[in-house]
């Protein structure tokens, strides 16, 4: 199951108590303070890892707790520290305080690690309180409680290429062709119900460059107002380096390609206007369903209405135009 939002209560460990104890030697039944300090409670940390793409492993959890520190002991022994708890999250995770909405951290790189809840300090044993004027202190302190925090984790996928289009535009078929995967396809809306990730590289190339591609669930008119799958997955568009709009040029499933493109761009800009500055290419898909003259006519009309856009013709089903698309990826996504 794809889980890209979750709320968790995080509880760091409590510090162990300090103890009152005395040295016991022959002929010296109370030979001075000998009680040790408590161990520190375990902290809770969050760390990004590769090859993780959702919060699925946390979906049935409501809270997580680190270990408590152990109490001190006689012979001035310090209690064992509680073990830290490290939560693994995908790159692209936003960590927020659930109570205030404050952004705590934006995890964008592998290996980032921060402390979210600090473990409580261990209490002091009576050895700590020995002074020149108080040789036999009877005081010890309890351990401090660990921090408790209610947090929200939100994932915005980080991918090189994001496939965007209406349901049944052929995105999943094209995704399968490019990433050589088996994403479910079918002739009904919302075949793709959650983002799919795949690795794209050109077969037969001596020096291959691999890109991460995300197939975003189909967007419908009104998605920016949360219709259809709506805002659930529009967030994943924000971090892709290149947006690949997949338009059904055949016009068989829906209305005209020009109208599709106009509505699609309008929905994305209504969701977040800054998306207009993102690099984008329009993939005119299903050209195998048109005669050559029909292709030329429809492409000419699209270029006339969208003169600033870059178009590429292809068929995800037959593979026509796919090599040109690989070349485009190389030129657009080169370091």
UniProtKB/Swiss-Prot annotation:
GO terms for cellular component: cytoplasm. It comes from the Bacteria. The keyword Metal-binding applies. Keywords: Cytoplasm, GTP-binding, Hydrolase, Magnesium, Metal-binding, Nucleotide-binding. Its EC number is 3.6.5.-. GO terms for molecular function: GTP binding; GTPase activity; magnesium ion binding. The keyword Nucleotide-binding applies. One of its GO terms (biological process) is ribosome biogenesis. NCBIfam families: Obg_CgtA, PRK12297.1, PRK12299.1, small_GTP. An essential GTPase which binds GTP, GDP and possibly (p)ppGpp with moderate affinity, with high nucleotide exchange rates and a fairly low GTP hydrolysis rate. Plays a role in control of the cell cycle, stress response, ribosome biogenesis and in those bacteria that undergo differentiation, in morphogenesis control. Monomer. Belongs to the TRAFAC class OBG-HflX-like GTPase superfamily. OBG GTPase family. This is GTPase Obg. It comes from Chlamydia trachomatis serovar L2 (strain ATCC VR-902B / DSM 19102 / 434/Bu).
């Amino acid at each position: 199951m794809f889980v890209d939002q979750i709320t968790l209560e995080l509880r760091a460990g409590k510090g162990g108590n300090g103890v009152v104890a005395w040295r016991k030697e022959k002929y010296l039944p109370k030979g001075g303070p000998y009680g040790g300090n408590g161990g520190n409670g375990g902290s809770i940390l969050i760390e990004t890892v590769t090859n993780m793409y959702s919060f699925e492993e946390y979906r049935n959890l409501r809270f997580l707790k680190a270990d408590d520190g152990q109490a001190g002991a006689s012979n001035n022994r310090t209690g064992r520290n509680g073990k830290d708890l490290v939560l693994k999250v995908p790159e692209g995770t936003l960590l927020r305080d659930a109570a205030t909405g404050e952004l705590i951290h934006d995890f964008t790189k592998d290996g980032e690690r921060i402390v979210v809840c600090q473990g409580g300090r261990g209490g002091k044993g009576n050895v700590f309180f020995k002074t020149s004027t108080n040789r036999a202190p009877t005081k010890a302190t309890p351990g401090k409680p660990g921090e408790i925090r209610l947090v929200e984790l939100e994932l915005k996928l980080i991918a090189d290429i994001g496939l965007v289009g209406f349901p049944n535009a052929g995105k999943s078929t094209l995704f399968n062709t490019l990433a050589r995967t088996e994403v479910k396809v079918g002739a009904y809306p919302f075949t793709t119900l959650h983002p799919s990730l795949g690795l794209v590289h050109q077969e037969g190339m001596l020096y291959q460059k691999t890109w991460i591609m995300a197939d975003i669930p189909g967007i419908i008119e009104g998605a920016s107002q949360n219709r259809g799958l709506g805002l659930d997955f529009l967030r994943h568009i924000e971090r892709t380096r290149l947006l690949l709009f997949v338009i059904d040029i055949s016009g068989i499933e829906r209305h005209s390609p020009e109208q599709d493109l106009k509505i699609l761009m309008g929905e994305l800009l209504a969701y977040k206007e800054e998306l207009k500055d993102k690099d984008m290419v329009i993939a005119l898909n299903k050209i195998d369903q048109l005669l050559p003259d029909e292709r030329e006519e429809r492409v000419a009309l699209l270029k006339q209405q969208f003169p600033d856009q870059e178009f590429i013709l292809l068929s995800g089903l037959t593979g026509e135009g796919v090599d040109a698309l690989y070349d485009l990826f190389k030129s657009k996504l080169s370091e």
